[in-house]
């Protein structure tokens, strides 16, 4: 409400609907310029994660990746194993479709360093599997698919600048949606009932392709993300 044009009011309404659905669907959300107000939602939410939803999202993800040549994947700043494992899972999905794929990494902290080294030291994996912020900015253009995992807030993404360089953004996350959203995502799968981003990716991979085969390192990363993030 209170937008300067009908088009802006429509955009406010669309964002409010996405927020309400992302927070469980039992709240009314009002967006008044930069102010977000929530009403209701006192009842406990019931688990809604279903195989049907995962299958639909998996097919949609396959369509978007399949229709583009380059895929860039990133998680959140200060990458943890859940974010990293989810990114690796999406990387494998892209490679199954013979697409160029890259994972954006900034500073590599101790919690994932050993995992990153497993791939860097394995000649089966391309040298450009991991790219820096600078490299990502050079790679991404309007025809690149940018997949964001384990966060739905633009300010928390590993390299937020590339969100403005593409027209095709996919968001896969298990955190509740806040008032800060990634705008213009062509596919948004936000499931607060999932224990981890890796759990969501594991479900998606089941339906992504019949012939998908994870290598041992990849499966270990995804499993570690599920175990550690669930315990946290």
Show the residue positions of the predicted features.
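Internal hydrophobic scaffold segments of catalytic domains
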Residues: 7, 15, 19-22, 93-95, ...
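Catalytic strand-loop-helix junctions within cyclic-nucleotide turnover domains
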Residues: 1-12
């Amino acid at each position: 409400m209170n937008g300067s044009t009908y088009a802006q009011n429509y955009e406010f309404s669309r964002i409010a609907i996405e927020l309400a659905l992302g927070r469980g669907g039992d709240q009314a959300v009002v967006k008044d310029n930069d102010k977000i107000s929530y009403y209701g939602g006192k009842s406990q939410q019931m688990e809604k994660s279903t195989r049907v939803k995962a299958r639909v999202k998996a097919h949609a993800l396959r369509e978007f990746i399949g229709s583009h040549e380059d895929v860039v994947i990133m998680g959140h700043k200060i990458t943890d194993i859940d974010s990293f494992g989810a990114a690796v899972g999406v990387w494998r999905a892209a490679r199954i479709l013979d697409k160029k794929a890259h994972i954006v990494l900034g500073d590599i902290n101790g919690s994932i360093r050993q995992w990153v080294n497993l791939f860097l030291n394995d000649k089966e994996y391309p040298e450009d599997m991991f790219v820096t912020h600078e490299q990502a900015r050079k790679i991404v253009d309007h025809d690149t698919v940018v997949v964001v995992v384990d966060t739905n807030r633009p300010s928390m993404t590993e390299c937020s600048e590339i969100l403005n360089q593409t027209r095709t953004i996919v968001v896969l996350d298990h955190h509740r949606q806040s008032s800060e959203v990634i705008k213009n995502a062509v596919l948004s799968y936000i499931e607060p009932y999932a224990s981890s981003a890796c759990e969501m990716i594991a479900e998606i991979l089941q339906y992504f392709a019949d012939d998908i085969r994870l290598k041992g390192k990849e499966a270990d990363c995804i499993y570690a993300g599920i175990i550690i993030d669930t315990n946290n």
